[in-house]
Amino acid sequence: MSVGAHRTAPSAAADSGRWFRRYRATGSVHRRLLVLPHAGGSASFFHAWGTAFDPGTEVLVARYPGRHDRLTDPCVDSMKELADQVTEALLPLLDVPVTLFGHSMGASLAHEVALRLRDRHGVRPAALHVSSRRPPHRLNPKRVHTEGDEALLEEVRRLGGTDEALLTDPDLREIFLPAIRADFTIVGTYGPRRAAPVDCPVYAYVGDQDPDVPVAEMSAWSDVARGAFRLDVLPGGHFYLVDRHDVLVGTVSDRLLADG
């Protein structure tokens, strides 16, 4: 099925508003970029991306349940369930080409969403961008979600990318710890699996000092690409994209325009 031919029920449109923070394009919408955050992350982490692209690009950032705007929604602790729900919420927005960008856990989620769009709905994403995450067949999950609160929070702190106040303030910790544990349950139970290929360009990004994702492992995303594959290595660690924001966004922007 071609992009633009998809039709969905009104309830799916309502789900889109719940699942995505939507930064509307300043001109006519020619393409959409869906950003999928990391474990323990939220849409606000990618707020600067909302206005960083050309006028024809509408940016969507996933709002995972159990935090911020969705604090009262039940957390999701299964990759299958999370990917199913994100895919369904995206269906009303397939009238223009959609590119997927996922960071860390979000990279695995982006890959799963790309597969569901193709296999269940006959839609090929314009491209798949994956950041700071091993490909599916090279995963080595840590089961930190089975440990106590302090061990879990220490892992979050080690990786970075989460507001320190959420980790140290007792009241905030009580509010957000269930969502953090749910995310790390996804990470810890999503083990090695077949490198199911996608029918779109695959672009991979990693920091040269990432403690968990060596460059050689990131390059193995090429096994997922049936077509074009590019790997960009940037200075930094697991959250290189904070200090290298302008470089990364510029590269993603150029590829968005090239791919549709």
Regions inferred by a protein language model and the residue ranges of each:
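Domain-scale detector for complete catalytic domains at protein termini or as standalone homologs
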Residues: M1-F101, M105-G260
